[in-house]
């Protein structure tokens, strides 16, 4: 299911047995090593420099890479997203100083490597992703996914809904991703949520899409979403304002049911996140992204993803750094995370 090199496992054991011990403070959880004791360039390139393991068994939450961009319609490169997000995550520390969240004092978390996708066959990749996530979800672990293009969310939600039933969705994106097909193909990064509706994977009364914008092929690009009962919040409704009030409404709408967070990095303005395949001008800010994710605290979150980071268009590394921090923020709002 998960591809990991034997040498990576050995290096991880050596690193975390010898170098990370000083920052564990007798914790029974995995803890990112402090740069006070372990230099940031040292060790295996894992998410947050956490231990690497081949299975999600025994974990409360796991970072999972899905290095696939076969479903892209514009600029490729998201297959390298997981690798670069992991590399930039060395800057993320143990505690969330802004919210007080202490995920590594609360949950057992590790990096379980990458799904062995088939870059030559998108339907087969979807099967591989679905089967991998069925095992992860069945173990009781909450997956936090490093994408990859947005087509990966469809098979992930197949696995998640198999266990939890139809889920609510907090979807941040420049696009609704509800197209039906392109060039005769029904699976690509513009169709995941259409396919999810077709298969009953979403509780459509609890779907919110935030940051949608850009030109359209149709005169009413939101008609399909509205017809399903989705709430669409265009980017224009977010300009120059805090999204804290909006997220209060979202929490009420989501209620106690299972919720999945899907965050396409192109939901943010390309001034902040240029390293993506289908950028659209006039998007959200990083501060609004934090308000959205932190506003999900208290929800019954059963999975998250951060998709569409394409490092080849990210010269400074800022897009991947932003992605790494947003994934950390998602970890911080999972059920069971204590505050200091």
Curated annotation (Swiss-Prot):
It comes from the Eukaryota. Its EC number is 3.5.3.11. Its cofactor is Mn(2+). Pathway: Amine and polyamine biosynthesis; putrescine biosynthesis via agmatine pathway; putrescine from agmatine: step 1/1. It is found in: Mitochondrion. GO terms for cellular component: mitochondrion. This is Agmatinase, mitochondrial. It comes from Gallus gallus.
């Amino acid at each position: 299911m998960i591809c990991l090199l034997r040498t990576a496992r050995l290096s991880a054991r050596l690193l975390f047995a010898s170098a990370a011990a000083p920052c564990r403070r007798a914790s029974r959880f995995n803890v990112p090593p402090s740069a006070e004791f372990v230099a940031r360039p040292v060790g295996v390139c894992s998410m947050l420099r956490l231990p690497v393991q081949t299975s999600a068994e025994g974990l409360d939450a796991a970072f999972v890479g899905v290095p696939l961009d076969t479903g892209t319609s514009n600029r490729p490169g998201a297959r390298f997203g997981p690798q670069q997000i992991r590399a930039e995550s060395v800057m993320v520390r143990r505690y969330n100083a802004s919210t007080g969240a202490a995920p590594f004092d609360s949950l057992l978390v590790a990096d379980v490597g990458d799904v062995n996708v088939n870059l030559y066959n998108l339907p087969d990749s979807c099967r591989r992703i679905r089967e991998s996530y069925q095992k992860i979800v069945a173990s009781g672990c909450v997956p936090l996914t490093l994408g990859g293009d947005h087509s990966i969310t469809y098979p992930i939600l197949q696995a998640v809904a198999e266990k939890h039933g139809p889920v609510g969705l907090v979807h941040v994106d420049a696009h609704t991703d509800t197209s039906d097909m392109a060039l005769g193909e029904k699976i690509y990064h513009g169709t995941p949520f259409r396919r999810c509706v077709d298969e009953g994977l979403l509780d459509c009364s609890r779907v919110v899409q935030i940051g949608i914008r850009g030109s359209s092929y149709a005169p009413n690009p939101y008609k399909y979403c509205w017809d399903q009962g989705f709430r669409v919040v265009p980017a224009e409704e977010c300009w120059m304002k805090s999204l804290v009030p909006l997220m209060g409404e979202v929490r009420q709408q989501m209620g106690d049911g299972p919720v999945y967070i899907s965050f396409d990095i192109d939901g943010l303005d390309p001034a902040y996140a240029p390293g993506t395949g289908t950028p659209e001008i006039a998007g959200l800010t990083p501060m609004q992204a934090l308000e959205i994710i932190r506003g999900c605290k208290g929800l019954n979150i059963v999975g998250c993803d951060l998709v569409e980071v394409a490092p080849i268009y990210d010269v400074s590394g800022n897009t991947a750094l932003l992605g790494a921090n947003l994934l950390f923020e998602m970890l911080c709002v999972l059920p069971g995370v204590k505050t200091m």
